[in-house]
């Protein structure tokens, strides 16, 4: 699921703006709520719905209003959001029954093998120039750090602690990702500041605060649900 989700996201990004991709991908918060509710035959609480709405709005608009026109790339990105939602739900299910470290290691190995196979089957894995680029100065180390730190250890922490959260809570927390990316981009001068950063980031932050502080008050057994 993780491999297919990231692959479809990259394919979609080839033909749409990053802001549109961010908005459509953020729909995984909504899909997580829908699928979880359908599976449990129970509607989310009002607090959860408010948190989902704020998180989806914030993640989608932190880079400004998306200029959305529906095409193949947009539908592929929506499919990516569904896959991310399923990944969150299946992670919740399996890590409550299996060792999270083993699950993380297996997932990382499977994704690595699938990604490597994709490079050679449909990419330019046979082009020596591409490999020379990867092993050139200033490229290899960031690639390794992103793979080990940005992927494996993030996946490990996700699997270790997500089992203690309701899937919708987890999805809303994950939606904070564009906030950190935007802050990092601002620090490096890669992103221009706009009022939408405050609006989108604020909506995400408020959505998380509302869910974390009020969901257990409204339903004390919430985090015990699967």
Residue ranges of each PLM-predicted region?
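Specific transmembrane alpha-helical segments of multi-pass solute transporters/efflux pumps
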Residues: 1-25, 59-62, 147-165
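Hydrophobic alpha-helical transmembrane segments of multi-pass integral membrane proteins
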Residues: 47-54, 72-79, 90-91, 95-148, ...
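Hydrophobic transmembrane alpha-helices of multi-pass small-molecule transport proteins
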Residues: 44-64, 80-84, 115, 195-215
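Hydrophobic/small/kink-forming positions within alpha-helical transmembrane segments
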Residues: 2-3, 7, 29-34, 82-85, ...
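Structural signature of hydrophobic alpha-helical transmembrane segments
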Residues: 11-28, 72-83, 137-148, 202
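C-terminal-most transmembrane helix of multi-pass membrane proteins
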Residues: 139-141, 149, 175-226
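C-terminal transmembrane-helix exit sites in multi-pass transporters
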Residues: 9-11, 28-50, 179-199
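Membrane-interface helix caps and helix-loop-helix hairpins in membrane proteins
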Residues: 11-16, 41, 63-72, 190
């Amino acid at each position: 699921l993780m491999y297919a989700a990231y692959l479809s996201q990259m394919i979609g990004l080839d033909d749409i703006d990053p802001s549109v991709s961010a908005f459509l991908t953020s729909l995984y918060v909504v899909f997580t709520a829908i699928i979880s509710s359908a599976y449990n035959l129970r509607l989310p609480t009002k607090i959860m719905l408010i948190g989902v709405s704020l998180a989806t709005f914030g993640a989608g608009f932190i880079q400004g209003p998306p200029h959305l026109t529906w095409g193949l790339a947009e539908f592929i990105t929506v499919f990516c959001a569904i896959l991310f939602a399923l990944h969150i739900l299946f992670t919740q299910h399996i890590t409550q029954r299996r060792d999270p470290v083993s699950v993380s290691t297996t997932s990382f190995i499977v994704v690595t093998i699938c990604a490597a196979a994709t490079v050679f089957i449909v990419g330019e894995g046979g082009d020596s120039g591409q490999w020379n680029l990867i092993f050139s100065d200033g490229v290899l180390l960031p690639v390794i750090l992103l793979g080990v730190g940005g992927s494996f250890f993030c996946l490990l922490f996700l699997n270790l602690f997500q089992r203690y959260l309701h899937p919708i809570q987890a999805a809303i927390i994950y939606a904070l990702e564009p906030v950190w990316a935007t802050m990092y981009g601002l620090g490096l001068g890669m992103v221009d500041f706009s009022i939408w950063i405050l609006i989108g980031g604020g909506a995400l932050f408020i959505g998380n605060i509302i869910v974390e502080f009020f969901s257990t008050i409204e339903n004390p057994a919430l985090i015990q649900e699967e």
